[in-house]
Protein backbone atom coordinates (compact mmCIF):
# COMPACT_ATOMS: atom_id res chain seq x y z
CA UNK A 1 0.00 0.00 0.00
CA UNK A 2 2.91 2.29 0.76
CA UNK A 3 4.32 1.94 -2.76
CA UNK A 4 0.90 2.50 -4.28
CA UNK A 5 0.50 5.74 -2.36
CA UNK A 6 3.90 6.87 -3.53
CA UNK A 7 3.04 6.07 -7.12
CA UNK A 8 -0.22 7.96 -6.85
CA UNK A 9 1.51 10.98 -5.30
CA UNK A 10 4.08 11.08 -8.10
CA UNK A 11 1.36 11.03 -10.72
CA UNK A 12 -0.62 13.68 -8.88
CA UNK A 13 2.51 15.82 -8.83
CA UNK A 14 2.91 15.29 -12.55
CA UNK A 15 -0.66 16.27 -13.18
CA UNK A 16 -0.10 19.48 -11.25
CA UNK A 17 3.15 20.17 -13.07
CA UNK A 18 1.90 19.57 -16.57
CA UNK A 19 -1.85 19.42 -16.76
CA UNK A 20 -3.08 21.36 -13.79
CA UNK A 21 -3.75 24.46 -15.82
CA UNK A 22 -5.87 22.74 -18.44
CA UNK A 23 -9.09 24.46 -19.21
CA UNK A 24 -12.18 22.35 -18.75
CA UNK A 25 -14.29 21.76 -21.80
CA UNK A 26 -16.41 24.87 -22.14
CA UNK A 27 -19.80 25.24 -23.75
CA UNK A 28 -19.49 26.26 -27.37
CA UNK A 29 -23.12 27.17 -27.79
CA UNK A 30 -24.87 30.34 -26.73
CA UNK A 31 -28.50 30.80 -25.83
CA UNK A 32 -30.67 30.21 -28.85
CA UNK A 33 -27.84 28.64 -30.84
CA UNK A 34 -27.86 25.08 -32.15
CA UNK A 35 -24.06 24.90 -32.42
CA UNK A 36 -22.93 21.87 -30.42
CA UNK A 37 -19.84 21.96 -28.17
CA UNK A 38 -16.75 20.09 -29.29
CA UNK A 39 -15.74 17.66 -26.56
CA UNK A 40 -12.05 16.87 -26.43
CA UNK A 41 -10.48 14.10 -24.39
CA UNK A 42 -8.14 15.00 -21.55
CA UNK A 43 -5.29 13.55 -23.60
CA UNK A 44 -6.11 15.87 -26.50
CA UNK A 45 -6.28 18.83 -24.14
CA UNK A 46 -2.87 18.05 -22.63
CA UNK A 47 -1.31 17.66 -26.07
CA UNK A 48 -2.87 20.85 -27.36
CA UNK A 49 -1.86 22.96 -24.38
CA UNK A 50 1.41 21.43 -23.22
CA UNK A 51 2.89 19.40 -26.10
CA UNK A 52 3.02 21.72 -29.13
CA UNK A 53 3.75 19.94 -32.39
CA UNK A 54 6.59 22.23 -33.44
CA UNK A 55 9.30 21.17 -35.87
CA UNK A 56 12.70 20.42 -34.33
CA UNK A 57 16.02 19.19 -35.68
CA UNK A 58 18.01 16.31 -34.18
CA UNK A 59 21.78 16.18 -33.74
CA UNK A 60 21.83 14.13 -36.95
CA UNK A 61 20.05 16.86 -38.92
CA UNK A 62 16.71 15.04 -39.10
CA UNK A 63 13.52 17.13 -38.99
CA UNK A 64 10.96 15.86 -36.49
CA UNK A 65 7.61 16.96 -35.09
CA UNK A 66 7.72 17.28 -31.31
CA UNK A 67 4.39 15.64 -30.51
CA UNK A 68 3.80 13.40 -33.52
CA UNK A 69 7.31 11.95 -33.75
CA UNK A 70 8.81 12.25 -30.26
CA UNK A 71 6.06 12.21 -27.65
CA UNK A 72 2.86 10.57 -28.90
CA UNK A 73 2.33 6.99 -27.66
CA UNK A 74 5.70 7.00 -25.89
CA UNK A 75 7.26 6.98 -22.44
CA UNK A 76 9.70 9.88 -22.38
CA UNK A 77 12.22 11.73 -20.24
CA UNK A 78 13.26 15.24 -21.23
CA UNK A 79 15.24 18.24 -20.07
CA UNK A 80 16.51 21.58 -21.30
CA UNK A 81 20.20 22.46 -21.54
CA UNK A 82 22.74 24.24 -23.74
CA UNK A 83 26.15 23.10 -24.88
CA UNK A 84 28.30 25.99 -23.63
CA UNK A 85 26.99 25.95 -20.08
CA UNK A 86 29.34 26.43 -17.15
CA UNK A 87 26.64 25.81 -14.55
CA UNK A 88 24.85 22.55 -13.85
CA UNK A 89 24.45 21.38 -17.46
CA UNK A 90 27.64 19.27 -17.53
CA UNK A 91 26.77 17.59 -14.23
CA UNK A 92 23.19 16.99 -15.29
CA UNK A 93 24.20 15.48 -18.63
CA UNK A 94 26.79 13.25 -16.95
CA UNK A 95 24.16 12.16 -14.44
CA UNK A 96 21.69 11.36 -17.22
CA UNK A 97 24.35 9.20 -18.87
CA UNK A 98 24.31 7.15 -15.65
CA UNK A 99 20.51 7.08 -15.79
CA UNK A 100 20.64 5.82 -19.37
CA UNK A 101 23.01 3.04 -18.37
CA UNK A 102 20.79 2.02 -15.45
CA UNK A 103 17.75 1.90 -17.73
CA UNK A 104 19.70 -0.34 -20.08
CA UNK A 105 17.98 -1.53 -23.24
CA UNK A 106 14.71 0.10 -22.17
CA UNK A 107 16.12 3.30 -23.71
CA UNK A 108 15.28 3.37 -27.39
CA UNK A 109 12.76 0.57 -26.95
CA UNK A 110 10.33 1.46 -24.14
CA UNK A 111 11.82 4.81 -23.10
CA UNK A 112 13.01 7.78 -25.13
CA UNK A 113 15.25 10.54 -23.77
CA UNK A 114 15.32 14.09 -25.17
CA UNK A 115 17.56 17.05 -24.38
CA UNK A 116 16.41 20.35 -25.90
CA UNK A 117 18.79 23.28 -26.24
CA UNK A 118 17.79 26.68 -24.86
CA UNK A 119 20.30 28.35 -27.16
CA UNK A 120 19.33 27.19 -30.65
CA UNK A 121 21.19 30.09 -32.26
CA UNK A 122 24.45 28.55 -31.04
CA UNK A 123 23.63 24.87 -30.76
CA UNK A 124 23.45 23.67 -34.35
CA UNK A 125 22.97 19.96 -35.11
CA UNK A 126 26.75 19.66 -35.54
CA UNK A 127 27.36 21.20 -32.11
CA UNK A 128 24.79 18.91 -30.52
CA UNK A 129 26.29 15.85 -32.21
CA UNK A 130 29.74 16.73 -30.91
CA UNK A 131 28.29 17.32 -27.44
CA UNK A 132 26.53 13.93 -27.41
CA UNK A 133 29.69 12.19 -28.58
CA UNK A 134 31.75 13.90 -25.88
CA UNK A 135 29.49 12.39 -23.21
CA UNK A 136 29.32 9.01 -24.97
CA UNK A 137 25.54 9.16 -25.13
CA UNK A 138 23.95 5.90 -26.23
CA UNK A 139 21.10 5.16 -28.67
CA UNK A 140 17.61 6.30 -27.72
CA UNK A 141 18.73 9.70 -26.43
CA UNK A 142 18.13 12.54 -28.88
CA UNK A 143 19.46 16.10 -28.72
CA UNK A 144 17.25 18.75 -30.29
CA UNK A 145 17.42 22.28 -31.63
CA UNK A 146 15.00 24.42 -33.61
CA UNK A 147 13.61 27.86 -34.24
CA UNK A 148 14.08 30.07 -31.14
CA UNK A 149 10.36 30.89 -31.03
CA UNK A 150 9.47 27.20 -31.09
CA UNK A 151 11.99 26.39 -28.37
CA UNK A 152 10.55 29.15 -26.19
CA UNK A 153 7.03 27.85 -26.80
CA UNK A 154 8.14 24.38 -25.74
CA UNK A 155 9.83 25.67 -22.60
CA UNK A 156 6.75 27.52 -21.45
CA UNK A 157 4.29 24.82 -22.50
CA UNK A 158 6.22 22.14 -20.64
CA UNK A 159 6.26 24.22 -17.47
CA UNK A 160 9.97 25.08 -17.29
CA UNK A 161 9.17 28.57 -16.05
CA UNK A 162 9.68 30.94 -13.14
CA UNK A 163 6.91 33.25 -11.89
CA UNK A 164 9.43 36.08 -11.58
CA UNK A 165 9.80 37.56 -15.12
CA UNK A 166 13.39 38.61 -14.43
CA UNK A 167 14.39 35.09 -13.40
CA UNK A 168 12.29 33.50 -16.12
CA UNK A 169 14.39 35.36 -18.70
CA UNK A 170 17.58 33.73 -17.36
CA UNK A 171 18.16 30.52 -19.32
CA UNK A 172 20.16 28.87 -16.56
CA UNK A 173 17.01 28.90 -14.39
CA UNK A 174 15.47 26.18 -16.56
CA UNK A 175 18.19 23.54 -16.83
CA UNK A 176 18.01 21.83 -13.47
CA UNK A 177 14.82 19.79 -13.77
CA UNK A 178 13.71 16.67 -15.61
CA UNK A 179 10.20 16.06 -16.86
CA UNK A 180 9.09 12.50 -17.60
CA UNK A 181 5.84 10.93 -18.56
CA UNK A 182 3.75 8.20 -20.12
CA UNK A 183 1.95 10.15 -22.85
CA UNK A 184 -0.90 7.72 -23.68
CA UNK A 185 -1.72 7.22 -19.99
CA UNK A 186 -1.29 10.93 -19.22
CA UNK A 187 1.03 10.25 -16.27
CA UNK A 188 3.59 13.02 -15.79
CA UNK A 189 6.07 13.88 -13.05
CA UNK A 190 9.53 15.33 -12.59
CA UNK A 191 12.58 15.56 -10.37
CA UNK A 192 15.91 17.41 -10.12
CA UNK A 193 18.38 16.46 -12.82
CA UNK A 194 21.19 16.17 -10.28
CA UNK A 195 19.33 13.74 -8.03
CA UNK A 196 21.10 10.41 -7.55
CA UNK A 197 20.82 8.41 -10.77
CA UNK A 198 19.27 5.41 -9.02
CA UNK A 199 16.64 7.66 -7.43
CA UNK A 200 15.77 9.14 -10.83
CA UNK A 201 15.37 5.67 -12.33
CA UNK A 202 13.20 4.45 -9.48
CA UNK A 203 11.01 7.57 -9.41
CA UNK A 204 10.74 7.53 -13.18
CA UNK A 205 9.73 3.88 -13.24
CA UNK A 206 6.95 4.33 -10.70
CA UNK A 207 5.69 7.56 -12.23
CA UNK A 208 5.35 6.26 -15.78
CA UNK A 209 4.21 2.73 -14.98
CA UNK A 210 7.51 1.01 -15.74
CA UNK A 211 8.65 -0.25 -12.30
CA UNK A 212 10.66 -3.10 -13.85
CA UNK A 213 13.15 -0.54 -15.14
CA UNK A 214 14.36 0.21 -11.62
CA UNK A 215 14.27 -3.44 -10.51
CA UNK A 216 16.23 -4.63 -13.53
CA UNK A 217 18.80 -1.93 -12.86
CA UNK A 218 19.30 -3.38 -9.39
CA UNK A 219 17.32 -0.69 -7.52
Where do the language-model regions lie?
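N-terminal secretory signal peptides and thylakoid transit peptides that target proteins
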Residues: 2-17
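Boundary at the C-terminal end of the N-terminal hydrophobic targeting segment
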Residues: 28-32
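N-terminal "domain-start" segment that seeds a small globular fold
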Residues: 34-68, 91-95
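Short active-site neighborhood of thiol/selenol oxidoreductases, capturing the structured segment around
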Residues: 66-90, 96
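Conserved helix-turn-beta segment immediately C-terminal to the redox Cys motif
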Residues: 92-115
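Thiol-based oxidoreductase modules, predominantly thioredoxin-like and allied folds used
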Residues: 110-123, 140-149
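Short, internal strand/loop/helix patches
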Residues: 130-175
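Thiol-/selenol-based redox modules, centered on thioredoxin-like
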Residues: 167-219
Amino acid sequence: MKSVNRRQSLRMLGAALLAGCLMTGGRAQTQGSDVKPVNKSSREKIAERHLPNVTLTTQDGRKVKFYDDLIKDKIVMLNFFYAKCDGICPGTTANLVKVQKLLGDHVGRDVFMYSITLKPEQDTPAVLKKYAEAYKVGPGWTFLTGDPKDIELLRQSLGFTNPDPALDAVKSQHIGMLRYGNEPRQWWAGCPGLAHASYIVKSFGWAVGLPKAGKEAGQ
